[in-house]
Amino acid sequence: MIYKDNDNKMPVVAILMRMLALAGPDKRPLIERELRMMRAGIAAEREAAALIDMYLKDSTRTAVVHDLRLVPNEGGAAQIDHLLIHRSRRFYLLDTRHFSYGLRITDDGDFLRWSEGAKQPEPIPSPFDDLARQVSVLRDALEPFGLDDAPVDTLVLLAPNARIERPRRFDSARVMKADQFLERLNNGLDNAPALTVLGNLNRTRMSDSIGDIANRLIALHRPSTADTLARFGLGRHGPQARACADEPAPVGAAIDGAQ
C-alpha cells in the first residue's frame, strides 16, 4: 500500500526557471546546475515510483513511502527516495539515479558518469555513502519502535534502459535497473527465515502495524523546498519567490530537459 507519494517539486522548479530568466552571468551557472539536478531527480524518482506503485499499491504486506526526508537533531538531512516496510519488519531503502549516458563502476568501487560528448567519464560521489547516511538516520527514527537494529537493505536503482559498466572485482550487486528490483525484493523479503521474521515482530508492539510505522515516519518528514530556495537567498513565501513565480515556465518543459 502507498502511504506517501512524491512531494510536488514543480513549484520550486518553476521559480528557479523564472529566476534563470532574470539572473545575471554570475548566478546563471548555479541555477542551471540546480535545475539539472532537480530535473534528473524528478525523472528518476517518478519512473521508479511508477514501477513500485504498479506492483505494490494493493499490497497488504509492504508499506511504501516515497520521498521521505528526515532531519535528525544534530542536523544534516537524509533524503530517502523510496522506503519499503515489509510485514516482517524488514526495510528497503531505494536510491534512484538518472544517468542519460551511462554509469561506470570501477574495481575500487568508484562511480563515474558519462556525459554528452565526453571522451572520459567524470567521477561522482558514491551513492553507497548516501545510503549509509540514510540508514543511520532511519535507525535513529526507528528507535522508539525497538527497531533500530532491524534489517535494512539498500539498493541503487537506475532507469531500465541505463547503460552500466560493471567491475570484475568490486561487488556492484546493489546497483540494478529499476525493473529488476522486484525479483530482489521478493527473494529478500518473502523468503526470510521464519525465526528472523518472528524475532522482528516480537520487538514491536502488536499495535505497531507497518502502516503505523509508515505514518509515524511520515510525520517526521521535512520537505526540502525551503532549503532549496534558501540557497538562492529566497524564502518560500517571500516577495522575491512570489515575484519569480508570477510567470512560471511550463511545467512540462521543466521535466523534459532531464539529463
Where are these regions (language model features)?
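Surface-exposed interaction regions that form or flank ligand-binding interfaces
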Residues: 1-79, 86-90, 115-259
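Active-site beta-strand-loop-beta-strand hairpin of nuclease catalytic cores
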Residues: 85-113
